[in-house]
């Protein structure tokens, strides 16, 4: 197929603009975040060392692997989440019956005594390992550790939340979340994935992702708020971070995500936080399904993919619903105010219009 020369010229210009944007904006953002990560992890490691002295069951899994920290998630340049993996689910069964959107429970196996569990005092009368009880104990230990650690002058616990959150130097927020890793399991609520008839991802990658499994996090679940569920405090939030990261390997998908995050931080960091980097990551995964071929993710296609993701984001904001990639019954906009979502839709449309109509737009963005 012959392609008009002016289209090739426009594509070449956009590739040049994208490369320049990555060098001028994306890499600067990454360097700033890397610097923050080094300090954040140094402080949190010191706090967790103190926690472990008080309570050996909470062993820090925050280890440095060639500059990468396992369990560290960047929410924004000033907000981080650190997952601490707990030991020995042991005598507990994973129960996912769909009654708790985005969540599941851990229940004592039939015939097993509480005393056989490492976490005996956090098991309820009904035999459930309570996420809230474990988090409450962990929060107390972290608060005590903050008062004793070497960085006590610059690190403070954030009050008025059941989450374990620290404020460092008054400007960085770090959430520390206890979790269990569920390898070799795949939740029933995500059993529909991947959808039949869609060629992405490749079956080998699907098998790899499902074998790797998922995490269960002890944190507040927005999907359950207001439901007055008796299970709300005992439930664990399902997390697929490793699966999502595995799916985004190859071609320019990771690069696309880095550009989206940079655009979000610079132009869509709005009141009420209606658009997060996780929303963009989710829509990127849906875009991968729409464009399954590797050639559709080469550098000359990135601008089209980003515009497609922003148009989908506008649609989600206007409908006030953004379905989770693996758990589509879970709405990632739940808890966001209609006004904040409406304002975000206007801002995203303004940004998209600039990108669609100006080949040199990235010089200003």
UniProtKB/Swiss-Prot annotation:
InterPro entries per record: Mab-21-like_nuc_Trfase, Mab-21_HhH/H2TH-like, MAB21L/cGLR
Pfam families: Mab-21, Mab-21_C
UniProt xrefs under SMART domains: Mab-21
Family: Belongs to the mab-21 family.
Name of the molecule in the record: Protein mab-21
Organism: Drosophila pseudoobscura pseudoobscura
């Amino acid at each position: 197929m012959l392609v008009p020369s002016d289209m090739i010229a426009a594509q070449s210009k956009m590739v040049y603009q994208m490369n320049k944007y990555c060098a001028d904006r994306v890499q600067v953002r990454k360097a700033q975040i890397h610097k923050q990560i080094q300090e954040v992890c140094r402080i949190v490691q010191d706090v967790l060392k103190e926690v472990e002295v008080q309570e050996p069951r909470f062993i820090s899994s925050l280890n440095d692997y060639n500059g990468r920290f396992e369990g560290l998630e960047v929410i924004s340049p000033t907000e981080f989440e650190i997952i601490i993996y707990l030991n020995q689910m042991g005598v507990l069964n994973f129960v996912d019956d769909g009654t708790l959107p985005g969540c599941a429970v851990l229940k004592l196996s039939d015939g097993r005594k509480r005393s056989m569990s490492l976490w005996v005092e956090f098991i309820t009368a009904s035999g459930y390992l309570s996420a809230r009880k474990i988090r409450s104990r962990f929060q107390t230990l972290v608060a005590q550790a903050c008062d004793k650690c070497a960085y006590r002058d610059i690190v403070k616990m954030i009050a008025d939340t059941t989450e374990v959150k620290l404020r460092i130097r008054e400007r960085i927020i770090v959430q520390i979340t206890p979790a269990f890793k569920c390898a070799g399991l795949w939740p029933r609520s995500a059993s529909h994935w991947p959808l039949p008839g869609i060629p992405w991802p490749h079956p080998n990658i699907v098998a790899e992702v499902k074998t790797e499994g998922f995490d269960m996090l002890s944190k507040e679940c927005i999907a359950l708020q207001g439901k007055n569920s008796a299970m709300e405090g005992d439930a664990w939030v399902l997390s697929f971070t490793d699966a999502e990261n595995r799916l985004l390997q190859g071609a320019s998908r990771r690069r696309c995500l880095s550009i989206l995050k940079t655009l979000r931080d610079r132009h869509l960091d709005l009141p009420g936080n209606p658009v997060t980097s996780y929303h963009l990551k989710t829509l990127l995964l849906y875009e991968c399904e729409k464009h399954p071929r590797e050639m559709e993710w080469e550098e000359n296609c990135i601008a089209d993919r980003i515009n497609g993701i922003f148009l989908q984001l506008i649609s989600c904001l206007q409908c006030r619903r953004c379905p989770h990639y693996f758990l589509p019954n879970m709405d990632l906009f739940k808890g966001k105010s209609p006004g904040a979502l409406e304002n975000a839709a206007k801002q995203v449309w303004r940004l998209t219009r600039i990108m669609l109509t100006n080949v040199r737009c990235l010089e200003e963005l």
